Amino acid sequence: MAEQLDMGRLNLNDSQHAPQNGFNGERSAYIPPHLRGRPQGGPPPMNAAPPMMNGGGGVGGSAWGPAPGGPSPAPPARFDGPPPGQMNGGGNWANANAQAFTPRGRDGPQGGGGWGGAAPGKFDPSAYGKPGGGGGGSARGSGDGQWKDGKHVPGPSNPRVERELFGVPNDPSKQQTGINFEKYDDIPVEASGQGVPEPVTRFTNPPLDDHLLSNIELSGYKVPTPVQKYSIPIVMGGRDLMACAQTGSGKTGGFLFPILAQAFQNGPSPPPTAQAGGYGRQRKAYPTSLILAPTRELVSQIFDEARKFAYRSWVRPCVVYGGADIGSQLRQIERGCDLLVATPGRLVDLIERGRISLASIKYLVLDEADRMLDMGFEPQIRRIVEGEDMPPTAGRQTLMFSATFPRDIQMLARDFLKEYIFLSVGRVGSTSENITQKIEYVEDADKRSVLLDILHTHGAGLSLIFVETKRMADSLSDFLINQGFPATSIHGDRTQREREKALEMFRSGRCPILVATAVAARGLDIPNVTHVVNYDLPTDIDDYVHRIGRTGRAGNTGIATAFFNRGNRGVVRDLLDLLKEANQEVPSFLESIAREGSGFGGGGGRGGRGGGRGRGNAATRDVRRMGGGGGAGGFGGGGWGGAPQGGYGGGYGGAPAGGYAPPSGGAYGGGGGGGGGGGYGGGYGNPSGPGGNSWW
């Protein structure tokens, strides 16, 4: 064994650890490989100054001593940092010219000092509640803009962020202006109210801000849409607004443009005086603008638009919605939240947690307001608007946007809006003439085979197929996949990650067929959808309007096909009216079925609200200017001017002859002319009637 190891030739004095120069006859301490070969020397005296730490990074030098072969450094000053003017430091790990380590010396503009950042400044407890959570004046926002000395200072351009937000020319994932976009100028616009300002015709300063104009140009917008032409001067003039416009006509820009323009001009609001301070990030956010929308997809879409137009500004948009990790949303809010886009349920949750205050709100936007009420969000909305610390109606601007505003929603708006201007663009509650509507008579058993024929015929572009149930969405997408069509589905039971993945694959064209329930029907801006198929017709004509509005957006043309059979006769009258309004071909079987059903009345609109949401003029006109007039064959009617004979009754000026005035404590009951009986007697009843309960 000894011969194998050749122990005889081992000599401990040849070792790196052997004593050098007879140093007391003792072995030296272990020397790491990267320190071997340095000039030898004894340890410094105990009272010597600490060694310089100019870190020759890597193998050639130590992070804790002078560089190899370098001159002996002068003793550093005490722990007060480098001399002024020598603040080129950074970390002490890779720069051979770095200055001595300082725990917290004089931090210079180039990042000297151990923390390597901006000057910490003095502790200011009042700064920790401000938007952005203090931070000693550091840049913040969607880009890197700042509000400094009473002026908006935009941040530098970032090509990577620009590509992410605005895409590249002819990017298929971004909506391009369609061939009929210029025809929007021919759409009639009706604005009612006191002191309606003149519309604008171009994006200019004034009224908009120069920085916003540059972001609008980056987005590829050339001229304002009709709703934007009116909403910009109305909101910039400090007025409340209720706006109806065709889907895809620029409603989102209609409220984002004026809100952001005023934010860029006026700066952030001062924080409330009494705040609970915090260390590091702020504990509670004080947004100045709140945008409420009904679905996760819609708030995400609005947030993406807000990021575009707030690019390089001091405004930091945030989005919160249910079904996603609340921790990441809280961290986003803590970094600063000036413009908040939220679903009502998640916002109430964050308010209860004490993480959001509405005390600084200047602008409240309700997008797809009728849909939010239909989905049961009214208690949360009323709590947010009336039950928390939001300024009263007179202390904020309130904007309501939707493609339809039925009568009861307009009446509800009087609680939230003050002296508002009602804006109706085009045939609101109707559909775009850019959409070619086809109604096919198809029995349920034949729907799948007819759908395959349609997909074979209209194979190009993106196809969006609407069904009524979650089970049908998965079943139909599986069927299409088995038939060789790339399809995916989106509905309420899929996780947020799955829904976002499905939408991304659909938008990009990797999966050009999307089967969806109503969750994807309202407000989603999915560009370049060429064909919408209503595999299952909805029971509500407004839902049909919003579904087919996913195509024909921004002036593009599209096709909408609906499968109709006798099981859908409840919407036949409304469907007929809709086709005639949009100058579409009316199939003969629709008129035949409509005549069959005329005995039991149609046009009841959303029966769940007493039928008052029929397709009468109330869905498109300012209810303040109306004196009644029911929906076709429905309950409708009422209003401030009184109900027609036998109509629903229940107005704000008392129920005249024939209108339904509830008896004492009345709830449900008669009075319903026009077929179908009365709706909610006392529910929407006459507040001045004997014992009638006002719904609001």
Swiss-Prot record:
It is found in: Cytoplasm. Residues 232-423 form the Helicase ATP-binding domain. Residues 12-23 have a biased composition (Polar residues). Its main location: cytoplasm. Belongs to the DEAD box helicase family. DDX3/DED1 subfamily. It holds the Pfam family Helicase_C. This is ATP-dependent RNA helicase DED1. Its EC number is 3.6.4.13. ATP binds at A245, Q246, T247, G248, S249, G250, K251, T252. Residues 434-594 form the Helicase C-terminal domain. It comes from Phaeosphaeria nodorum (strain SN15 / ATCC MYA-4574 / FGSC 10173) (Glume blotch fungus). One of its GO terms (cellular component) is nucleus. A motif (DEAD box) lies at residues 367-370. ATP-binding RNA helicase involved in translation initiation. Remodels RNA in response to ADP and ATP concentrations by facilitating disruption, but also formation of RNA duplexes. It catalyses: ATP + H2O = ADP + phosphate + H(+). The gene is DED1. Residues 68-85 have a biased composition (Pro residues). The keyword Nucleus does not apply. The Q motif is unique to and characteristic of the DEAD box family of RNA helicases and controls ATP binding and hydrolysis. Residues 54-63, 108-119, 130-144, 598-615, 666-696 have a biased composition (Gly residues). SMART domains: DEXDc, HELICc. Keywords: ATP-binding, Cytoplasm, Helicase, Hydrolase, Initiation factor, Nucleotide-binding, Protein biosynthesis, RNA-binding. It comes from the Eukaryota. Residues 1-178, 597-622, 659-696 are annotated as: Disordered. A motif (Q motif) lies at residues 201-229. One of its GO terms (molecular function) is RNA helicase activity.
